[in-house]
């Protein structure tokens, strides 16, 4: 949760013209008067002085800059388009491309660059804003103290928004040193100054208040940085400083709630959120932040972590409603459609969090088991965050879940004959049983429309997975971290909903480069490897469903070649490869993949971040057991996975007319699980074997009882090739996990 408001750039970014060499006393007087009027909020008077200055010195672009700034503040900061246009014109006029900043002239132009960086920040063009801010930081020594602090605070905010916590902490250390030195210098000057006692005391009180506010802001930024880095011990120390300096304000309580959320103390996190006084917040028109929206979103994130997904989606919908209400109020103030950034305070350009909230809603709905509703949310979010490979995977999982059978059918079998007997025809001696077809090959999932049209079809799932693979970097073949498969658990990962469990950490290796994945937090090397495994598993499943066996085999082989592959996905890789090979009539190769000894582990893997997080807790502080649990997936154990392998191996032996081996596999598998857990495909396989053996009555008994019966030892020769009934391909077992992004 990053509820603390960003650096109030609007209050410090524009300073009036200061005296410079080569100007007359009249210009100096007008300049000082203009600045004093601007500081007092008398913008009309300020503009009058600036007009007089413009008449005297028409070539000074700084007067035009200050005029534009004064007019911007006169409009209550609602003419962003006009200010932006003026700044661009001035930039071209002084031929000051950012790349050319290398001298004292650029120090003189620093105010122009800073204002551009602030506008880029509010337009969410963070990379460009960082580029300008870092150039300014190179020349920070000659700057006035207040302006230097403003540059640093802007850069800190940008670094945190882009998950560069280490850089943010470095700048915060510089800021602390700067404020400490400035305070000492001021104390020394006050001792020898000739100001009156009254003016001196007022100035000192005002200066002290500003210093305390800056220190409080620094502590809040440190908490946000440590939260991103999952350094909970350091975060705990800073939280105490925040509570001491900011008290029980909404930003401090939101930050502490986020801290408790990361520790697993979910009830305490909810309690802290509920204790925050939202009514005291200045409002989104002044800060650009809708605190009610953040409140509901954070509650949704906490309940998601507690596996209370229905409550979570309830809170996310409340957050969406608040966000839509705020956006409706803001759009009502815009009158000129050609100026989309005007007619509203500049800070409100950052207010709309619709797409981050849609991301959260989509992930939550996917967990609830409503893939079509989740698809509608995520397909809207992907239009903004189209460079996020994890988001494309989530869309594909929506399509898969919307087009597959129920999980009970796949994992628990059927207690009745519903999945085996399609109908009964005839009467008496002519009575016949029509068995249900279990084949899913070459299924047509769309109705003739283009697969590029975003509908929850398997064809569109294939496109989503292709996009996800293309967005992954190619150099992922040098593993450094422990084996594990963690689908990045994220509900939006930027500053809108929660800090994700895979944010860039100070504990990461130097070789681990973070790949941006907004609105989630960045993907590190280990997360990229795990994500690639999940994408390949889904790709193989989708290709099998579409009947593209060669592509399915290709994806399955690539999956099995991954250096960091969890036991669960390795099991699926062998299963999908075997099914593709059987469809390609390469039975011997398929039998190799179906060897039960290939399955030695079905774990999902453990996130190194969760291990780090646990190590930061005190000895007597236990994490609540209600959240952050590993999903219960199929297969749940090595024995159940080997059972699936044996059932499929029996089918493969049938295709080679090796019925003794098939029967042995079938009954070996049946002995390993409860009779009610036998899948309908295995019962059909037993029926087929008995029919081939000539035991029609026994086959009927198997159908009637819907369970396997003891084997009959005599076998008859098979006269026709069996029809292979493959076990329904299992969807990649890990539910879409994601990182709760909290503000």
Curated annotation (Swiss-Prot):
<keyword id="KW-0007">Acetylation</keyword>
<feature type="region of interest" description="Disordered">
    <location>
        <begin position="477"/>
        <end position="520"/>
    </location>
</feature>
<feature type="region of interest" description="Disordered">
    <location>
        <begin position="602"/>
        <end position="634"/>
    </location>
</feature>
<dbReference type="InterPro" id="IPR019734">
    <property type="entry name" value="TPR_rpt"/>
</dbReference>
<feature type="compositionally biased region" description="Basic and acidic residues">
    <location>
        <begin position="1"/>
        <end position="16"/>
    </location>
</feature>
<protein>
    <recommendedName>
        <fullName>CCR4-NOT transcription complex subunit 10</fullName>
    </recommendedName>
</protein>
<feature type="compositionally biased region" description="Low complexity">
    <location>
        <begin position="183"/>
        <end position="198"/>
    </location>
</feature>
<feature type="compositionally biased region" description="Polar residues">
    <location>
        <begin position="484"/>
        <end position="506"/>
    </location>
</feature>
<dbReference type="InterPro" id="IPR011990">
    <property type="entry name" value="TPR-like_helical_dom_sf"/>
</dbReference>
<keyword id="KW-0175">Coiled coil</keyword>
<feature type="region of interest" description="Disordered">
    <location>
        <begin position="1"/>
        <end position="26"/>
    </location>
</feature>
<dbReference type="GO" id="GO:0006402">
    <property type="term" value="P:mRNA catabolic process"/>
</dbReference>
<comment type="subunit">
    <text>Component of the CCR4-NOT complex at least composed of CNOT1, CNOT2, CNOT3, CNOT8, CNOT9, CNOT10 and TNKS1BP1.</text>
</comment>
<dbReference type="GO" id="GO:0030014">
    <property type="term" value="C:CCR4-NOT complex"/>
</dbReference>
<feature type="region of interest" description="Disordered">
    <location>
        <begin position="183"/>
        <end position="204"/>
    </location>
</feature>
<feature type="coiled-coil region">
    <location>
        <begin position="77"/>
        <end position="107"/>
    </location>
</feature>
<feature type="compositionally biased region" description="Polar residues">
    <location>
        <begin position="602"/>
        <end position="612"/>
    </location>
</feature>
<dbReference type="GO" id="GO:0017148">
    <property type="term" value="P:negative regulation of translation"/>
</dbReference>
<comment type="similarity">
    <text>Belongs to the CNOT10 family.</text>
</comment>
<dbReference type="InterPro" id="IPR039740">
    <property type="entry name" value="CNOT10"/>
</dbReference>
<feature type="modified residue" description="N-acetylalanine">
    <location>
        <position position="2"/>
    </location>
</feature>
């Amino acid at each position: 949760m990053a509820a603390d408001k960003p650096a109030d750039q609007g209050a410090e970014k524009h300073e009036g013209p200061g005296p410079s060499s080569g100007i007359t006393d009249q210009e100096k007087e007008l300049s000082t008067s203009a600045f004093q009027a601007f500081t007092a909020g008398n913008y009309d008077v300020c503009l009058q002085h600036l007009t007089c200055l413009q008449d005297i010195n028409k070539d000074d672009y700084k007067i035009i800059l200050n005029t534009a700034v004064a007019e911007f503040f006169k409009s209550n900061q609602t003419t962003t388009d006009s200010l932006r246009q003026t700044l661009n014109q001035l930039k071209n006029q002084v031929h000051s491309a950012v790349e050319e900043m290398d001298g004292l002239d650029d120090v003189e132009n620093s105010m122009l660059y800073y204002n551009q960086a602030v506008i880029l920040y509010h337009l969410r063009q963070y990379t460009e804003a960082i580029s300008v801010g870092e150039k300014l930081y190179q020349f920070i020594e000659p700057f006035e103290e207040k302006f230097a602090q403003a540059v640093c605070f802007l850069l800190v905010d940008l670094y945190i928004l882009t998950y560069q916590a280490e850089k943010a902490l470095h700048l915060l250390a510089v800021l602390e040193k700067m404020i400490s030195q400035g305070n000492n210098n001021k104390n020394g000057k006050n001792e020898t100054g000739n100001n009156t006692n009254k003016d001196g005391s007022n100035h000192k009180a005002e200066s002290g208040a500003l210093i305390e506010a800056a220190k409080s802001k620094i502590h809040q930024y440190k908490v946000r940085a440590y939260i991103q880095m999952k350094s909970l011990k350091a975060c705990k120390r800073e939280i105490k400083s925040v509570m001491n300096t900011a008290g029980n304000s909404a930003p401090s309580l939101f930050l502490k709630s986020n801290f408790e959320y990361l520790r697993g103390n979910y009830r305490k996190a909810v309690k802290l959120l509920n204790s925050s006084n939202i009514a005291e917040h200045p409002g989104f028109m002044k800060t650009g932040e809708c605190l009610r929206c953040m409140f509901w979103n954070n509650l949704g994130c906490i309940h998601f972590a507690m596996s209370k997904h229905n409550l979570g989606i309830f809170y996310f919908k409340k957050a969406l409603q608040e966000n839509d209400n705020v956006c409706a109020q803001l759009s009502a103030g815009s009158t000129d459609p050609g100026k989309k950034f005007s007619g509203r305070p500049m800070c409100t350009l950052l207010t709309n969090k619709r797409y981050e909230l849609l991301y959260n809603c989509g992930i939550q709905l996917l967990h609830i088991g409503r893939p079509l509703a989740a698809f509608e949310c995520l397909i809207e979010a992907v239009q903004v965050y189209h460079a996020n490979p994890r988001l494309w995977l989530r869309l594909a999982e929506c399509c898969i879940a919307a087009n597959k059978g129920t999980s009970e059918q796949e994992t628990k079998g059927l207690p009745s004959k519903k999945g085996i007997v399609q109908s009964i025809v005839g009467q008496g001696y002519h009575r016949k049983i029509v068995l249900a077809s279990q084949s899913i090959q070459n299924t047509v999932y769309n109705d003739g429309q283009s697969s590029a049209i975003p509908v929850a079809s398997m064809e569109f799932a294939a496109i989503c997975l292709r996009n996800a693979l293309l967005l992954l970097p190619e150099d992922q073949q040098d593993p450094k971290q422990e084996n594990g498969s963690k689908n990045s658990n994220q509900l939006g990962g930027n500053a809108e909903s929660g800090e994700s469990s895979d944010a860039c950490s100070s504990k990461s290796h130097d070789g681990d480069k973070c790949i941006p994945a907004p609105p989630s937090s960045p993907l590190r090397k280990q997360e990229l490897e795990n994500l690639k495994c999940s994408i390949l598993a889904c790709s193989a499943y989708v290709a099998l469903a579409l009947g593209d066996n060669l592509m399915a085999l290709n994806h399955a082989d690539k999956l099995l070649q991954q250096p960091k592959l969890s036991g669960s996905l390795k099991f699926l890789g062998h299963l999908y490869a075997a099914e593709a090979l059987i469809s390609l009539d390469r039975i011997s190769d398929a039998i190799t993949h179906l060897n039960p000894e290939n399955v030695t582990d079905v774990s999902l893997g453990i996130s190194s971040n969760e291990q780090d997080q646990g190590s930061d807790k005190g000895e007597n502080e236990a994490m609540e057991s209600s959240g952050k649990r590993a999903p219960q997936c199929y297969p749940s154990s090595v024995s159940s996975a080997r059972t699936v392998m044996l059932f499929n191996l029996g089918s493969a032996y049938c295709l080679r007319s090796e019925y003794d081996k098939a029967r042995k596999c079938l009954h070996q598998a049946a002995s390993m699980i409860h009779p009610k857990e036998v899948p309908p495909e295995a019962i059909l396989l037993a029926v087929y074997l008995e029919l081939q053996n000539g035991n029609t009555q026994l086959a009927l008994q198997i159908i009637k009882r819907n369970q396997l019966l003891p084997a009959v030892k005599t076998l008859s020769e098979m006269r026709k090739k069996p029809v292979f009934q493959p076990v329904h391909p299992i969807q990649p077992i890990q539910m879409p996990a994601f990182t709760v992004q909290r503000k």
